[in-house]
């Protein structure tokens, strides 16, 4: 999904991975045909930070209407300025209306709701809003260190309580995690597909004292009742076919060089369109420049199999050799 060291090109990578995850979740769980996107579908999640900030943008590229909850308004400001969310509001009513209006028209949108995800889920459930896809990307690897904000606290109150009353903060985190899980189960009963997105949310719920989240009803040795996105979506749809992240960087820092490589990659995939994964990747790289994915150096990520990586590398070498880039 992302990478370390010299392979890391910023959050663009997680946008592509999330785009693929959402599209294929729609196909596997919602019955969407391989040649269609998520138009007319609603995705709800939480988190607009360093990695989680990809969710709204990925949902838009995949064609979905989406609402992403985030308690830190500075994070929302970053994503809004960046163009990775299209709307922002602290009103549950307004956030829901914007998303549902776009969903009804089959148009994509990414609504950043400044508030707690549990408040959002309660509002949607009580107003009988059907959510097609649901996930979570709060920082549940450190829930008691500020990574998960308890319901009823603002972001600023959370920071103050964490400093002055960490034990009390932990109690509120556990209570909110338990209620968060209850709301997910209620949506699941209504047909929502929830998937774990690798942020330790399910483990955090278990650590809060919820044993029913475990497959064996007792402990986490056999895993959890909700699936991981890797085992349930990306594995069978992409990794099992050899598709994975392929990156290149234009060290000239010239956006025109990146544009030319995008065009070359799109032309190659279009000419060698073997399966629906290729079409998805074609759409991704065709629209990559328009979607303003670059952060920093002029780099691109594109899921490819071994054949695609090799042939694109040879094509780029040829372009350098001929002075095209």
Pin down the residues of each PLM region:
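Catalytic or ion-translocation cores adjacent to nucleophile or general acid/base/metal-coordination motifs
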Residues: 3-6, 10-20, 39-42, 48-104, ...
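A short, basic/flexible loop-to-alpha-helix module at the beginning of a structural domain
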Residues: 18-40
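Solvent-exposed alpha-helices and their adjacent loops that cap or buttress functional pockets
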Residues: 32-38, 60, 77-78, 101-106, ...
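Active-site/ligand-binding-proximal alpha/beta "capping" segment
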Residues: 110-138, 145
